[in-house]
Amino acid sequence: LLRYSNPIITADYPDPDVIRVGKDFYMVSSSFNYFPGVPIMHSTDLVNWELINYVIAEPVAGFNKVRSGEGAWACSIRYHKGIFYCLIPFPDEGLFVSVSIDPYGKWSKLKCLYEGKGYEDPCPIWIDDKTYVVFAFVKSRIGFNSKLGLIETDETLSAVLSDNYSIIYDGTEKDQTIEGPKVYKIGKMIYILAPAGGVEHGYQVGLSSRSIMGPFRRSVLLKQGDNGINGPHQGALIDIDDKKRYAFIHFEDQKELGRVVMLEPADIDCNGNIKLGINSLPVRDGVVLTKEDARSIDYSDSFDSDKLSLIWQTPAIVEAGWINPSKNGLVMNSRFQSLDDFISFPYRLCQKVSSYHQKASLILDLFLDEGDKMLFGIIGRSYLLIGVKKSRGKLYRIIATVNQEEVIDEITGTNGIILDVKYDYPNLCSCSENKKSVMIDKEHWTGLHYCIGLITHNSSSRGFAVLKRFTISK
């Protein structure tokens, strides 16, 4: 057996959903306004995960600007009759579907299944000859929450057959903010697992019935204990083999770092009761399947491919041509923005901060025009950036935060420039230049990312940089 320690993924992969197909496990998670959207990961042991693809590869209307926190919320993945289905909510647009016969291959363009504001966390289920989708509600969009809704669809999730949604569970009294439902049919029973009570201090609710319409028997399956693991939020029940063995994967809120992924033991007893964790409490360590040819997410990048590594995303849809990957480095072209605001700047490569304590270094060659700023750093709802700007014909090394830009020194060389930043959990970002550090707080930082961008105030700039290597170290 493989021993593991939680979290199994120390990076911001919120709202994970996981399925098993044969000996393979596939995970999807929320991506919000980052594109490509909805990452897909693969594992053979539930502990070691490799990033293999994204569901959303094509542009989505309305996301050519940075819309922080919007976009693709908690999705679900299912496998039915040889087809992978991913059901994705956009809280301001509706519930969307993408399908594929190969999770490593091309996924279909998003199709709206159920249009409207305020629907979130959809999960499909096929029961006998009918197909249903269970979902939750976003109070800020629709005026209420704490309820679970249901619609009937055709078998391929192409059309809604219901005249309207039905409320199948009302958690207003016992389970405030119940959301994130995942629905399963095991034997003759229907099970819905859903978190309630809020992200940081909530618990996992189990609902069971012989009918998708209820009535449901309610129980609390997983709750916060005294071992420092906060509210066990939404996730997935997984049948880990054909021997009726189970596991549960969920996220835990880790402040500025984001929502990390946790693995819990699970079981269904002879009376059909689901058991999660140990005595309904999350675990720090456990054992699971035998380790098989384990791979992991590679966060470093040598920029020696003509394709961009899967680890990089952008915070909005941007046009092709602003970057050009090659075997000799990745060329990043400058892009104009009048405001000196890096958060709203869409032309930046981003990847998740992936450890409680780590250093990230970027090596690059610079070919800047007047008014260009090459910036690298850590960004959430605020940022700490180190970089180089060209002003009055000279190059200056700079450090920038939201409210301040500081010139460190003038530089003369343009090749082999090294920029580095460091993150120390829970609330410190720093860079070695001038030993600059910034205390961060969750009001302004969430789901931290490393980011790289070349912004300019010169509308005729033809400046560019060649990225040579990005390295993660302790």
Q: For the regions a protein language model found, what residue spans apply to each?
A:
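Carbohydrate-active catalytic/glycan-binding domains of CAZyme proteins
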Residues: 1-474
